[in-house]
């Protein structure tokens, strides 16, 4: 975490943790080396490009300066010859009207490769500089580096009058790396500092993820832009593809592809994470993993992002059969398919999307890759079109024809309810579905893309008064949907009389068994806000949009706390409206009750005495009645105190009385 800068009369008088320096004696010394940095400098006085003026940042003269011709991804530093552990840095801005602001959010990096592909941050300047004065900051990084540099924030032309490094020679240790905040720091270092510029071209890079003072991930990769409308924002979203599969942080999947969601229009920076938590409380079989992170690209601080699963067929993600080109007949041809009802499908390459036969619903084939073979393409197109035909027929279970035979209605309802509770205008603009091999049923999920949900869309704001308690959001003229998809949803939710009880059952079970309430979700929101607090401050220094309308923002709240409170207030109203619309029943539960008076076995769970175990060694979780996690794993629990517990497995939930 960063420390505030300090003004110093004499930077030599300070104490290193664990080592006391006598008065007037430095425990680490001011370092010298060969000045390095961006070659093309700029002379403001003569309005011209000048070469190799890096030395001006180290000449001890606050009246000279280093500046670059290029506006972004420019830097200046030292080649120290050998690795040094840096203990302190000093800086002073160029004497200019914008000088003090141009050093703010500047990142100090260390590296041991001349190309800086292994660069990591060792300090971040979080305050404006002072013209004519040196400011100093203590560095908390145990690793030694040969190359050190200052990288200015974007569009600042690396304007700096003086730069100083203090430290001592040594390789250092790998147990004390610096992070920008308490969140993980993701460092993307591309070859030749190339910036990703579109969705088609992958830029080779190295990705380093720092968490809790250690390197979590350090691997070769490529990076490109991702997304559709989100790509139009100045804060760009990216996709990372590692050369080899990686385990990242606490994500359940080992995979090559990962996304960095920019959350530009979401001033809480948490809406996607909140929606994913709601999906988990609805017990959806796969909810994308996500984690808030700070991102640095080629030394430039880019803001707070969400590192997230690439939604794809992969163990630990959408765990269905991955098809091969030779899977063109018999049972092999039946799956697995991962598709997206997609309003943007028309922009995809030919052969990777289709429109359904009867109502022209646009569908993109996400897996198999490139739309698959002709046989695979034809199979899933025809299968989806048959489902569509059955949904729009009037024979719901009559004459032996029922769309429910090939469509998982429960998964569709769970997906719909996440969209309704979150107030997601775009629920049916983009809707994922999948079909596995040997399974006749198409399932709905996973959920995705909630940056304009939770009262963040001027087309529907305020949902409480404009949608109310007598209809669903997706039914209204305000909601957006891919062609034909809103009618598809209406047929299932409104025309099929069985769905009303299904919705009531699924909603009530989630409310009663899975801590789905305004109170408990707002506690989760508060926890996210606390976790994000340091990072959001830096993010909105980098992107000063808090008092601007961006994307679909309906109102300007003015500060982070009020943005968060608006989400919490919305949840209270939305639960009230949906409880009335759905007919919430507090007596409906899916939890089976068993006691430990004698050994009991239900759904693979064995209760013996005051211990709980899984017969098959499967993962299960034990919660107290207050919702606190007591145990998670596949082994036998320790002896539990007498009381009531909720045990959750992939097969369901149960109440255990010990």
Describe the residue ranges of each PLM region:
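Conserved oxyanion/phosphate-binding beta-strand-loop segments in alpha/beta enzyme cores
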Residues: 205-262
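C-terminal outer-membrane/trafficking sorting elements
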Residues: 594-658
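Middle-to-C-terminal accessory/interaction subdomains
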Residues: 196, 219-220, 229, 233-234, ...
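A short beta-strand element within beta-rich, extracytoplasmic domains
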Residues: 84-97, 150
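Disordered, acidic Ser/Thr/Pro-rich linker "stalks" and the adjacent N-terminal cap
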Residues: 28-81, 94-101, 127, 169-173
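Internal "kinase-insert"/substrate-recognition segments embedded within catalytic cores
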Residues: 241, 246-247, 255, 262-263, ...
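Trp- and acidic/polar-enriched beta-sheet ligand-binding modules for extracellular glycan
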Residues: 70-74, 97-169
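Extended extracellular/luminal ectodomain segments enriched in beta-structured repeat modules
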Residues: 72-73, 81-90, 144-145, 255
């Amino acid at each position: 975490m960063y420390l505030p800068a300090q003004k110093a009369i004499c930077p030599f008088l300070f104490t290193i943790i664990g080592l006391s320096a006598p008065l007037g004696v430095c425990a680490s010394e001011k370092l010298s080396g060969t000045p390095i940095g961006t070659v093309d400098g700029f002379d403001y006085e003569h309005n011209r490009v000048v070469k190799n003026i890096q030395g001006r940042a180290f000449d001890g003269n606050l009246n000279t300066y280093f500046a670059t011709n290029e506006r972004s991804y420019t830097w200046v530093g030292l080649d120290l010859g050998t690795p040094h552990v840096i203990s302190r840095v000093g800086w002073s801005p160029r004497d200019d009207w914008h000088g003090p602001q141009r050093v703010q959010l500047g990142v100090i990096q260390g590296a041991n490769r001349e190309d800086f592909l292994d660069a990591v941050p060792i300090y971040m300047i979080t305050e404006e500089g002072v013209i004519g004065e040196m400011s100093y900051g203590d560095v908390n990084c145990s690793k030694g580096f040969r190359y050190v540099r200052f990288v200015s924030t974007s569009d600042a032309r690396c304007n700096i009058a003086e730069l100083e490094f203090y430290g001592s020679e040594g390789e250092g240790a790998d147990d004390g790396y610096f992070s920008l905040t308490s969140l993980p720091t993701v460092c993307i270092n591309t070859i030749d500092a190339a910036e990703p510029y579109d969705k088609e071209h992958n830029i080779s890079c190295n990705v380093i993820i720092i968490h809790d003072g250690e390197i979590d991930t350090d691997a070769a990769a490529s990076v490109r832009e991702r997304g559709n409308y989100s790509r139009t924002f100045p804060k760009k979203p990216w996709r990372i593809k590692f050369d080899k599969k990686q385990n990242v942080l606490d994500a359940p999947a080992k995979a090559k592809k990962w996304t960095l969601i920019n959350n530009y229009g979401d001033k809480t920076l948490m809406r996607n994470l909140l929606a994913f938590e709601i999906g988990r409380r609805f017990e959806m079989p796969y909810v994308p993993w996500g984690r808030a992170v700070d991102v640095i690209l080629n030394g430039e601080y880019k803001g707070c992002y969400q590192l997230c699963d690439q939604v794809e067929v992969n163990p630990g993600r959408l765990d269905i059969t991955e098809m091969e080109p030779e899977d063109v007949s018999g049972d092999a041809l039946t799956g697995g398919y991962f598709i997206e009802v997609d309003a943007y499908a028309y922009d995809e390459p030919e052969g990777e999307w289709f429109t359904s036969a009867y109502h022209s619903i646009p569908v993109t084939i996400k897996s198999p890759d490139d739309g698959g073979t002709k046989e695979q393409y034809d199979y899933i197109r025809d299968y989806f079109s048959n489902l569509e035909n059955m949904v729009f027929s009037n024979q719901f279970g009559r004459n032996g024809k029922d769309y429910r035979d090939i469509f998982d209605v429960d998964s569709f309802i769970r997906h719909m309810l996440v969209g309704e509770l979150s107030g997601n205008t775009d629920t049916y603009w983009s809707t994922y579905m999948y079909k596995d091999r040997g399974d006749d049923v198409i399932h709905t999920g996973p959920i995705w893309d909630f940056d304009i949900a939770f009262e963040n869309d001027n087309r529907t704001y305020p949902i409480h008064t404009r949608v109310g308690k007598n209809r669903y959001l997706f039914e209204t003229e305000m909601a957006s949907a891919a062609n034909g998809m809103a009618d598809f949803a209406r047929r299932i939710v409104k025309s099929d009389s069985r769905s009303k009880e299904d919705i009531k059952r699924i909603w009530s079970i989630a409310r009663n068994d899975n801590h789905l309430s305004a109170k408990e979700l707002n506690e989760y929101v508060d926890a996210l806000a606390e976790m994000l607090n340091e990072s959001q401050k830096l993010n909105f220094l980098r992107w000063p949009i808090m008092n601007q309308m961006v994307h679909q923002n309906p109102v300007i709240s003015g500060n982070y706390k009020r943005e968060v409170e608006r989400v919490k207030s919305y949840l209270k109203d939305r639960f009230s409206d949906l409880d009335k619309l759905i007919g919430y029943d507090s007596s409906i539960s899916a939890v089976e009750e068993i006691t430990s008076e004698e050994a009991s076995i239900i759904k693979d769970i064995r209760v013996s005495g005051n211990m709980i175990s899984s017969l098959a060694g499967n993962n299960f979780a034990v919660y107290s009645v207050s919702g606190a996690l007591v145990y998670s794993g596949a082994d036998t629990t320790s002896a539990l105190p007498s009381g009531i517990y909720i045990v959750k497995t992939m097969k369901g939930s149960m109440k255990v009385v010990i």
